[in-house]
Each structure stands twice: as C-alpha cells, then as structure tokens.
Amino acid sequence: MLKVENVTKYYGDFKAVDNLSFTVNKGEIFGLLGVNGAGKTTTFRMIMGLLDPTEGNITLDGKKIDYDVTDDIGFLTEERSLLTKLTVKEQAIFYGNLKNMKNDEILERLDYLLDKYGISEYKDKKIKELSKGNQQKIQFILAILNKPKLLILDEPFSGLDPFNVELFKQEIVELSENGSMIIFSSHRMEHVELFCKKLAIIMKGKTVIEGYLKDIKEKYRKKNIFIKANIKREDLTKIPGVVGVIEKSDEFEVKIIDNEVVDKVFDVVKKKGNVTKFVVEEPSLNEIFVSKVGKEYDK
C-alpha cells in the first residue's frame, strides 16, 4: 500500500501541498486530479523521493520512501524526459541500471515490451529519430521496465493515436490486475472515469474531494435529465429547481439541483404527452470538477 499521510510541502513561504492524505492499495488505480499548479507534480516528486515533505509521511508497503524503495516505482511524466542522443537500447540500460536491474534482465524485458508494442525495429535507433508517438511508447516502456509495484502515470496518452491509446489502456489494466498500484492523472475525465474507482481532486495543494467515484457522484446533488417529448424549452425552464436547459436536435438536456426535482419535471413532461425518453443520469466527473475548481479541466 502507498500511504500519503498529512503531507505538507513548502517552497520558502509558499505552501505547494497542504496536509494531503490518501492511500493506494495493491491493484488499485487512483486518480489524482487538479489544474496546473494544484500541487500534483510536487506530490509526485515527493512520492518518488526526489523531494522531502516539510511535514507528514509517505510510505510504500510500510517503508519510508528512500532510494531503495524507489527501485519499485515507475514514473511516466507529462513532459518528454528521454535522452534524445541515446538509442532506445542505451536509454533502457541507463534507466534500468538506475533501478538496480542487471543488463541481461533489462534487455530481456526490453525485447519483450518492444515486440508487444510492435516497435522492435527501433531498438538501435536514437530517440531523436523517432516520432512523438513512438517516443511516448518508449517512455511508457521505460516506466514499466522494472515491473513497478507503484506506477505514476501523468497524461499517459499524450501524443498517441487512437490505436495506441487502446494498447496503453490494455497495459494499464493488465498491470493493475497483476497487483501494481497506479496513480493516474489526466486532463481527460472520461479516461479517469474509465480506470479509477477512487480519486482525489486537489486545488492549491489542498484536497477538495476525495473518495470513491461512485460515492462522490451520489453526494453531488445535481443531476441531468434527458427528455424527448412534445414540450417546449420554456415549459422546462420555469420549473422550480431546474438550473439549465440545453436544446439539442431532438431532445432536451435538463440540469436540476437535486433528485427532488425529478418528479416535478416528470409531471410537467407527462402532461404534455408523447414522452419517448426520460432518462436521469449522474453528473459527469468533468461537471463535478468544474463545480469544485471553477474551470474546465481540459482548457
């Protein structure tokens, strides 16, 4: 288990992380979300042992993070962090040695992963000669080269085409099923919802939401209703508790403040007749995020 307990980090007088706590269990994919500057990168660096917390503790399987423990951690950064003048093989040996892997172990694992991703022919090519998408593949391969207990993924699908996104998704699920703890951070909320049963949203270094996604959605009172019926927009906007109506080509999306408004909306719609659709949906994670941090996550 990864345990982050009451962690605070100052840079001088600036508090980058403020009393942050969460756990990631074996085989769990945990979402850590926040806008740029929220404190995610600082948190990742503390988990990696690159920075020491000013206050609090971080442990992996009960051991305080140190150089020995970080051998069991893999990290895919949002930014390219490859040494572009090295070949893929040289880069893998360099990275694997940092994780105390032996050269024959590194090359065996590298050959397996290159073959799995269909890029074996790039083994002796320099990083700078590869496309951005293939560089991202290599960066991902290096992050999982040591079969990490803990894997941190920061925007893992950046620069990938849809086919390779699916390959990465399959690999992430496989790693989780094999017991890896995964911290997943992305601007793409649909990806977070796909992978993460548990998450935290941080703002200015402080947790604003933390828990299981299912529970978070249930506690978030606003809902969306999708309606197809013989009804006009103004009939819906004047219902108490309706906070927004979006008119689409053949249906209305009605936003309400809580579940109690559902029956009111249904009564009005039913009286108008010809109801072919009335579906109540939970809010998306993106809607919840926007309500908490005040801006779109993907902007």
What are these regions (language model features)?
Residues 1-8, 295-299:
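ABC-family P-loop ATPase nucleotide-binding domain
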Residues 68, 216, 288, 292:
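Residues that scaffold the ATP/ADP-binding catalytic core of kinase and kinase-like folds
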